[in-house]
């Protein structure tokens, strides 16, 4: 059995850990609101961007001059998985859930005879994926030094993806990230970026015909690269909010668990101390009776 001194040290250590997890929870809570507002503000723009492009693409998708970012290169053999995760841990299943979804998609494609490559955004995703797919990771972008995620960060990633597509390194690109729903709910999401999946009009919706100046193909040639950056930017903002939500929830659970451990350890300490005092009293009384 541990001595009383060892028990006191253990209780003090648990209390110190509880202070750290509580502080991390408060920091995550303070940053979550801003991150959530940024993610929610980006959603309407990204969704409207997709809707506009889908409308224009409806007329251009079948034309010979349709941009390759829209129509693709006609092949479906090499898939690039753009996996966006966080730079830090201590956030529950936030990072692992995104990686798990990407890993499942990779194994599914490989079982079909497809070639899979990875483009990692975020240190945690890279560290997990390289255990199984080290030779298949063709690029890795870390944002540890970025204090606040900006559109320029998404543009840089989009330019790298487009350059590799134009170089013929892959045929299809799918984005993986975590969509923020609430503090306790973040949804791992997969979204195809290249070729762009055109959303069909809802059932019962009357299709509207537009005339564009300049031609649809020319408009799309300018819009599609920007849309790619917009969708990546949205994913980064959703990830940021999801990270702080997951971290806040994880640290709250850790703080509660630490409190429960302290309660149990204190109870054991008090019982042990009481037993030692009782034993000493019995020895004193027995000695007095012997005299």
UniProtKB/Swiss-Prot annotation:
<keyword id="KW-0375">Hydrogen ion transport</keyword>
<comment type="subunit">
    <text>F-type ATPases have 2 components, CF(1) - the catalytic core - and CF(0) - the membrane proton channel. CF(1) has five subunits: alpha(3), beta(3), gamma(1), delta(1), epsilon(1). CF(0) has three main subunits: a, b and c.</text>
</comment>
<keyword id="KW-0406">Ion transport</keyword>
<dbReference type="GO" id="GO:0005524">
    <property type="term" value="F:ATP binding"/>
</dbReference>
<keyword id="KW-1003">Cell membrane</keyword>
<dbReference type="GO" id="GO:0005886">
    <property type="term" value="C:plasma membrane"/>
</dbReference>
<dbReference type="InterPro" id="IPR000131">
    <property type="entry name" value="ATP_synth_F1_gsu"/>
</dbReference>
<keyword id="KW-0472">Membrane</keyword>
<comment type="function">
    <text>Produces ATP from ADP in the presence of a proton gradient across the membrane. The gamma chain is believed to be important in regulating ATPase activity and the flow of protons through the CF(0) complex.</text>
</comment>
<comment type="similarity">
    <text>Belongs to the ATPase gamma chain family.</text>
</comment>
<dbReference type="InterPro" id="IPR035968">
    <property type="entry name" value="ATP_synth_F1_ATPase_gsu"/>
</dbReference>
<dbReference type="GO" id="GO:0045259">
    <property type="term" value="C:proton-transporting ATP synthase complex"/>
</dbReference>
<dbReference type="GO" id="GO:0046933">
    <property type="term" value="F:proton-transporting ATP synthase activity, rotational mechanism"/>
</dbReference>
<dbReference type="InterPro" id="IPR023632">
    <property type="entry name" value="ATP_synth_F1_gsu_CS"/>
</dbReference>
<keyword id="KW-0139">CF(1)</keyword>
<keyword id="KW-0813">Transport</keyword>
<dbReference type="Pfam" id="PF00231">
    <property type="entry name" value="ATP-synt"/>
</dbReference>
<protein>
    <recommendedName>
        <fullName>ATP synthase gamma chain</fullName>
    </recommendedName>
</protein>
<keyword id="KW-0066">ATP synthesis</keyword>
<keyword id="KW-0997">Cell inner membrane</keyword>
<dbReference type="GO" id="GO:0042777">
    <property type="term" value="P:proton motive force-driven plasma membrane ATP synthesis"/>
</dbReference>
């Amino acid at each position: 059995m541990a001595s009383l001194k060892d028990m006191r040290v253990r209780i003090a250590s648990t209390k110190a850990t509880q202070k750290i997890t509580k502080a991390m929870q408060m920091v995550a809570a303070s940053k979550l609101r801003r991150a959530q507002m940024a993610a929610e503000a980006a959603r309407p723009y990204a969704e409207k961007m997709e809707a506009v492009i889908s409308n224009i693409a409806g007329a251009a998708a079948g034309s010979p001059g349709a941009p390759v970012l829209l129509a693709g290169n006609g092949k479906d053999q090499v898939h690039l998985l753009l996996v966006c995760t966080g730079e830090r841990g201590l956030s529950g299943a936030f990072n692992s859930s995104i990686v798990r979804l990407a890993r499942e998609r990779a194994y599914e494609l490989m079982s079909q005879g497809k070639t899979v490559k990875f483009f990692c955004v975020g240190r945690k995703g890279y560290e997990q994926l390289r255990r199984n797919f080290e030779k298949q990771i063709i690029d890795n972008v870390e944002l540890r030094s970025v204090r606040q995620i900006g559109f320029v960060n998404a543009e840089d990633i989009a330019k790298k993806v487009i350059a590799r597509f134009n170089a013929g390194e892959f045929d299809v690109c799918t984005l993986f990230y975590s969509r923020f729903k609430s503090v306790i709910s973040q949804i791992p999401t997969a979204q195809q970026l290249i070729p762009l999946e055109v959303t069909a009009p809802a059932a019962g919706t009357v299709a509207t015909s537009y005339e564009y100046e300049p031609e649809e193909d020319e408009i799309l040639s300018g819009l599609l690269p920007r849309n790619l950056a917009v969708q990546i930017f949205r994913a980064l903002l959703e990830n940021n909010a999801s990270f702080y939500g997951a971290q806040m929830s994880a640290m709250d659970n850790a703080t509660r668990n630490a409190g429960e451990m302290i309660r149990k350890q204190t109870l054991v300490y008090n019982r042990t101390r009481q037993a030692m005092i009782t034993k000493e009293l019995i020895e004193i009384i027995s000695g007095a009776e012997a005299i």
